[in-house]
Amino acid sequence: FDGDGDLDVLVQGQVDLTPFVLLYIENQSMDLYGTADSLKYRLVNPCWGHVREYISQTGWTEFVCDTGRAANQRLRHGGTTLTSLDLNNDGIVDLLTGDSYNPYLRSLVNVMDNVDAEIDLTLSDTTFPVYNQPAILPNIPAAYIEDVDGDGINDMLVAPNQLTDGATSFFDTSITKEVDWYYRNTGSNLNPNFELESAGFFSGEMIDVGARSFPAMVDLNGDQLLDLVLGNEGYTIY
């Protein structure tokens, strides 16, 4: 994040029952040893972006950070995915987030700098990418930035990070079908424009009947050839 060559960490955390905040934890390897091969971390910004998240449909809100957290207070993760990238070609890291309570990706646009960040929610989308087909995936969706088609420009893959969302039946795996979305970047790495190419990037080339699927081979029609029967846990049989 600070451009010195070692890997820093941005993580969501919670202190006791307070709303979830973003914590910037800086790797001190280059500062202390002159190399990027060590993991020596220090909490630098306990409220990165000056935003917090309630576990409800209200999502992210802006706030003034209280930096007086006691060092021994326990941090808890909030079931949120974070993907860092520059969304608007200003050279500053922005975020894409996914949550356990919402099937959409959200963008958080940073208007300050990478370390002392300031998220402007008026520039942020609650259904990303709002200019194309928004990603709608249950169970903590996450964005993965990779050059999928080999053109030197990073594309976006979106997939869930949990099998069930708790609201539906644990055994209803129908919502796990076609949950690997591929967005091609028709813009650039610094100013991306993601357009949906496929809602089944991997599963479109497979027999997709959802999670916990099991095959059975049996001759169903007596032609002495094995047929394929597929079922998944508690949903249906094919």
Label every PLM stretch briefly.
Residues 1-238:
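Beta-propeller-forming repeat regions
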